[in-house]
């Protein structure tokens, strides 16, 4: 997402990205990337770094790409104190399933402390699908919502060259409870006889404790020969997985878009996903299956 956004916006304007250092940094063309310290409300290092960047960059517009992080809310506050317009893109983080998860212990305190104000004060909210816009309107905090769909650089993605069955199914996304990987494991357990000779590859990074719980679930069901958790994959290895798999499977509870779905289709690999995504066209276009969990 940021690679495509930075590349294209950078052709039209001067683009700066404020972020934290990553173990797997992505090259983004036509923009300047600024790594800042991790937000800490006790010391002022993060605030000072961001303030200095604002003084140097003097932005005309700030585009915030997250929710539920005090650092993002702080950057929005700093921008609006300087009379800089702010666009907030929740990326599905304000979908009902997400808000309900840990509502009393995490979401409600965050809403009261900073997140509700951030949504209300944003000059514009960007939704990436009609379903996301409808849910943002139901939330009732800000009605100035525009739909700007996400996209991928399809021309740079190589189509698979063989449609011969590889007997490989692929999950490639963040390893998080929202993604419904447990349903994939349960389905494999039910269909273990039909899946003899198949591999289900689960690619992605996630919280160590959650990854460990999935591995334990796989062991408890005796599915070690079928399901493999391989960690995060990037670059050529990622595209190789898309191109060599028979299906891409994303059994998610909720997605505002699902970039990996678009990437799989661009690679020529059909997709099985849920009604928690806005990809109902999969059924009508015979490109996969859009199903209830």
Feature roles, as predicted:
Residues 21, 131, 151:
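Carbohydrate-associated surface elements
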Residues 137, 143, 147-166:
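Acidic anion/phosphate-binding donor-loop and adjacent secondary structure
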Residues 167, 171-190, 200, 209-213:
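A conserved mid-protein helix/loop that constitutes part of the nucleotide-sugar donor-binding site
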Residues 212-233:
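Nucleotide-activated donor-binding/catalytic signature segment of Leloir-type glycosyltransferases, i.e.
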Residues 270-273:
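Short hydrophobic beta-strand element within catalytic cores of glycosyltransferases
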